[in-house]
Amino acid sequence: MNEAQRKELANLIDKFSSGNGIHSTAITGVNCIKLNEINDRLPSVYTPSLCVIVQGKKRVLLEDEIYQYQPSEYLVASVDLPVIGQVIEASKDKPYLCLQIELDLHQLTELMAQTRLPFKNKIPNQRGIFVGDV
């Protein structure tokens, strides 16, 4: 995602988020997340989803591992996971903005079967959560 695309997505998330919190969109399973301030560590269970940060920074703890991600990076949770999340960069002028897309594992499995693409596991023994660049 280039800088112009990131800014455009940030403007859209800000526009469709009336205040702090998770905001549903007209598309089922797609949510906009906005926070105007950093928060304390918040225990929760991440469900299978893809989260793309477009503004701000977040830290997620899974047992003894720390996953930190920032604009133009994403976090994927592939299974239900007990984590502790914390937004570590946000303000009223530059709120934390994130696009969350829920993953339907049943649909993904069907899609993989229909495409008949070969499965290549290049990373053995990986956790059910990972961060990458958009």
Regions found by a protein language model. Name each.
Residues 1-26, 39-40:
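A short, N-terminal "cap"/entry segment at the start of jelly-roll beta-barrel domains
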Residues 2, 111-134:
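Amphipathic alpha-helical segments enriched in hydrophobic/aromatic residues interleaved with Lys/Arg
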